[in-house]
A protein has these predicted regions:
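Histidine-centered divalent metal-coordination motifs
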Residues: 77-79
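Conserved beta-strand-loop surface patch within small alpha/beta domains used
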Residues: 1-72, 81-136
Length: 136
């Protein structure tokens, strides 16, 4: 994800999906992998639209290698700002994703800024999205 930071004025937003595990013993989440931008994605300076093509195949490949022991855990994308904040479009998209059917009640949303990565999580049952506090 870091290699897609928008450090120059010409860099376009990038993004992908988060893939990982949910530990049964403590319900902790581990993000093991991420997809990278695909040729079918829309990438502009201030907009990224992920298409299913490519990302789904990438997930399927990881799922087979993990013998079905991995899950879709959310989305990531970049912003051309030092400390990223979600746009109204981001928030709407996250709420739309939360309404879809996934194994987990919680999904994660990462935005990679030029200096920091910020993380939010959303819960299906209460339809809330909350920023995870940064631990230094």
């Amino acid at each position: 994800m870091q290699r897609y930071r928008q450090l120059s004025q010409l860099d376009k937003e990038a993004g992908g999906i988060l893939i990982g595990r949910i530990l049964l013993e403590n319900e902790n989440f581990i993000i093991d992998d991420t997809s990278e931008p695909m040729p079918t994605d829309t990438r502009k300076r201030y907009r990224f639209i992920r298409t299913p093509e490519g990302h789904q195949e990438y997930f399927n490949n990881i799922w087979q290698k993990a013998e079905g022991r991995c899950f879709y855990l959310g989305e990531w994308h970049t912003h051309p700002e030092r400390i990223p904040t979600p746009s109204s479009i981001d928030k709407k998209d996250w709420m739309r994703i939360l309404k879809l059917d996934f194994e987990s009640d919680i999904l994660f949303f990462l935005i990679v800024g030029t200096k920091e990565i910020k993380v939010w999580y959303g819960q299906k049952k209460n339809k809330r999205i909350v920023e995870l506090p940064r631990r230094d």
